[in-house]
Structure formats: structure tokens, C-alpha cells
Amino acid sequence: MNGGSRLRVAIFCLQYFSSSFCLFKKRPYICNTRTPKPLNNAQIGGRFIFIAMSLNFNKSYTTPTSIVQLLRERRLGIADESKALHYIEHIGYYRLSAYLYPMLAEPKSNHRFKPQSTFSNAMSLYRFDKKLRLFLFNEIEKIEVAFRSAIANIVAEETGNIFWMTDASMFANGAKFLRTITLIEKELKSSKEEFIKHFKEKYSNDYPPAWMLVEILPLGTVTRIYENIANNALRKKIAARFGLPVPVFSSWMTVVTLTRNSCCHHTRVWNKENAIMPMQIKKTARAWISSSVSPKRIFYDICILKWFLDIIVPRHNMKTHLKNLLDQYPNVDITAMGFPKNWEEEALWK
């Protein structure tokens, strides 16, 4: 092919031999750059053809003025053009488009807005999402601090090894440990924290003790360190502090980390699907939510945060803050966030 587009086609014919493969019989399996999906009623076994396609991106830059004109042509109400231009220039249309998308009429590929859709509605949703991120981050901070404290102190207390975080014998997977050491050395080299400077100047040890390291490492790294601890009894004791079995605790801390990162990087969170599905707790003596609540949406993540806070800060006011935020924006579709109709009647929220 020539011109503005390029097509790459890879065809693989594979034979199903064992249960370790999941192939689709007599059906094409076609994907773009995302996860491939089988067409129609694909079946296990037999052969399949895998076709991977990619095209050159050929869209051109559009000025804010042209964008406003295009939005009007697509039937979006814009009461104040100067304000719309200001927001597009200072926020960026690409970011704002995520808040315009829910207002598109079906089929959305026609790019026509539903009746009564306005630019002001999109900005209101944008502000709600911003306040939601601030709310979430404020709650996550308490969980993050508690987790850092638990992992550093419990392992040191149980083993008597204050340098356990840089001791290869403490970990199950050597390759993962080496990657962690590389990250630790990188953080130590770049850290401007006074306590790290003081340690380097005063002591000859290669690495600081765990309670110092845990303060400079990213939350995701700390979570992976937890997962790689060889002694399962230690992992159980850390998870038990938060009322959870090891697999669920590990899964939920990953969700907390991803949500935290979304908040830090100003990513849309209000109606976004979880990149990683949180593990669902099956048996618990503590109040939790019904199985009908979707683990794909942010409400499930909010429930996870509340679980942790009920243990870490028993007299917290998370529910009050959440209700106040939702009351400020009554036009937000909370079902798109995964909220069930009577969410306050769930055992966790009573």
C-alpha cells in the first residue's frame, strides 16, 4: 500500500493441541491495537486466523475557533463563545471531549449531540470529575500511609531484620527483587529528602532501613514488594491488619494505586472502567456490598476505600463528603459511575 495509510497484516494459523491454548474454531479473530475479540459465536479448538491491522494517523490540527464552530454544527449549545474558547485553549479540547462524549446521541459515530446538550453541561461534568479526584486522593492518602507503615514495621518486627527490603533472601522471585533494587537505587540517587541525605552522610550501609525506604518509593513499588515477600505468614499478617485475605488485599492495593495515579495525573475517573478488575471478597464478617455491584466502575473502588478507612480511621466522614459532592452536581449520572439505585442501603454504607 502507498499514500496516507499503511496496512500491516499478520496471519497466523495455529492448531489447538492442549488446554493451555484458547483458540477459536473456524472463525476469524480480528483486532485493532486493543485487545482482540472473536467474531460472532467463536468456538474453542481448531484453527483460527489472526489479522492485525494498523493505519497511519492522518488527522490535522484544528484551531479552538474552528472547534467551537464544529460543535455548534453538531448541535451543541454554546451560550458564551468567548468562555468556550478560553476553556478549550487552557484545558485542551482533547481532554474536554471526554466530558462531551456522554452527551452524544446514538449512534455516537454520527457526532450529533442530544437535545438540550450544552458546553456548560460538559464543563460542569469536568468540574465534578476534578472534585471527585480531590476527594478520592484525600481518602487514599490515609490508606497509603497506613500501608507503608504496616509493611515496614510488621516485617521488621517479625524478622528482626530492619534492612529486609534490600535482602534477597526475603523474597520469592529473584528477578523481581533485582528490578526492585534498581528502582530503590534510582530513588535513593534522586531523593532530596533530608533524612536520606543525613543517612548517606552519617552511615556506611549500602541502603537505609525499611522504614526510610518505604517513604521514598512509589506506592506501586511498595505493593509489588509486598507481593514478592517469600514468607506467606508475613503477608497474611500485613493483610490481616486490614481485615483481608492476602489475594484480595494485594488486588485491592493495586486498585488503590491505580486510582491514586489517575487522581495525580488528572485522568478522568468518574465513569471510567477499571483497567484491572478488583478481586471480590466472598466471605467476611465485616459489612460489605452486594454481589450485584459492578467491580468495573469507580463506585466499587470507592467502596474499597471505605473498607480500608473503616479500619484505619473508624470515625471518618467519607460518606458525608461523598454525599455533599454528589448533591452539588445533581445532573451527574451516578449510574454511569456504578452506583446502584439504593447505594446508601448497602451494608457497607449504613
What are these regions (language model features)?
Residues 266:
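Acidic/aromatic/glycine-rich contiguous surface patches that form carbohydrate-binding/processing clefts
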